[in-house]
């Protein structure tokens, strides 16, 4: 089937709003996750999102990449898009048959699905918008990494209890607002065998374009969810304790112990809590945690960037 290549001629086309005029916050639409959209950037990130089950809506690609680096991922997007559409059509047909059937038997359901007819065409209806590099840069406001973007449907996030059910080692990001740091932490967490990442609601969303790109798509490979720290009722530290986790706050404190502390590393279920750039963790988080830990440093250096610090502590955990 031939790809549905659409050359961009009108910057104001409604279909391009998701790439040109909507903020990432508007795309994500946290209040209604079933309607939310995110933008994946680069072939590697898009492919990992597709492999994780996210459904594509459309692609925006630089012309020279259509038959080059972007070809395989465009074809994969198209296949998934068509399969999703057919599955949706089958569900609609099934519901219609069940509604109109007097007996609603299992055999009727199977017959209805088996006999759905699809219109075969030579042209895909998965939209692939394209233009030269300068036009795409002007449209989006930034230079596309590896020349391709893909708009995708987001999914409702799992509950904290589901994420933590079988986890032994998790990372908690408290108000980490920089998407580059969030992406780098996810990449380290995936590479160094952490089981999940939990984010407080003041943190950058891992599905932001830059966060997902910096993570190299690992935001689609490691389980994650948001946790509320509004202070209404039980604290998030309390929830983690209730789920069987000991908590270790990364902070410079008179009571801090080294990350290789035997008691810390021997905990069966451990949550490493990392704080926002600059201010670090909330005092209440530190006081409620079971441990306060630090990375031993030299030459008068007292701290590392949160993404760098996370890689060190994840590696240390992996060696125990």
For each predicted feature, which ranges?
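Active-site/ligand-binding-proximal alpha/beta "capping" segment
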Residues: 248-301
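Alpha-helix capping/helix-boundary segments
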Residues: 44-46, 65-66, 134-135, 203-204, ...
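Structured adenosyl-cofactor binding patch, chiefly the S-adenosyl-L-methionine
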Residues: 147-150, 188-192, 206-219, 283-320
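A glycine-rich helix N-cap at a beta->alpha junction
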Residues: 125-132
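Intrinsically disordered, low-complexity terminal tails and inter-domain linkers enriched
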Residues: 71-124
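RNA substrate-binding interface of SAM-dependent RNA methyltransferases
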Residues: 6, 79-82, 100, 123, ...
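Boundary-proximal intrinsically disordered activation/regulatory segments immediately upstream
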Residues: 1-67
């Amino acid at each position: 089937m031939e790809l549905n290549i659409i050359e961009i001629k009108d910057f104001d086309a409604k279909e391009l709003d998701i790439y040109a005029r909507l903020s990432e916050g508007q795309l994500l639409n946290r209040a209604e996750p079933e309607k939310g959209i995110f933008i994946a950037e680069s072939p590697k990130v898009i492919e990992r999102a597709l492999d994780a089950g996210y459904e594509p809506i459309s692609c925006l690609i630089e012309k020279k990449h259509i038959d080059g680096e972007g070809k395989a991922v465009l074809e994969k997007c198209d296949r998934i898009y068509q399969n999703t559409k057919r599955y949706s059509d089958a569900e609609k047909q099934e519901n219609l048959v069940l509604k109109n059937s007097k007996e609603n038997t299992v055999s009727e359901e199977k017959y209805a699905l088996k006999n759905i007819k699809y219109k075969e065409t030579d042209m895909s209806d998965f939209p692939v918008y394209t233009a030269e590099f300068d036009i795409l840069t002007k449209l989006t406001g930034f230079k596309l990494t590896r020349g391709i973007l893909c708009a995708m449907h987001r999914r409702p996030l799992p509950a904290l209890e589901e994420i933590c059910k079988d986890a032994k080692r998790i990372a908690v990001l408290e108000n980490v607002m920089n998407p580059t740091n969030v992406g780098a932490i996810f990449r380290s967490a995936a590479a160094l065998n952490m089981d999940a990442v939990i984010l407080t609601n003041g943190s950058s969303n891992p599905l932001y374009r830059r966060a997902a790109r910096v993570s190299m798509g690992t935001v689609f490979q490691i389980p994650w969810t948001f946790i509320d720290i509004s202070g209404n009722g039980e604290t998030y530290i309390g929830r983690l304790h209730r789920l069987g986790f000991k908590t270790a706050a990364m902070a410079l404190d008179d009571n801090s112990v080294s990350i290789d502390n035997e008691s810390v590393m021997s905990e069966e279920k451990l949550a490493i809590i990392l704080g926002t750039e600059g201010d670090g963790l909330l005092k209440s988080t530190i006081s409620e945690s079971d441990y306060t830990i630090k990375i031993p440093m030299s030459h008068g250096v007292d701290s590392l960037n949160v993404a760098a610090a996370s890689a060190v502590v994840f590696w240390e955990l992996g060696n125990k």
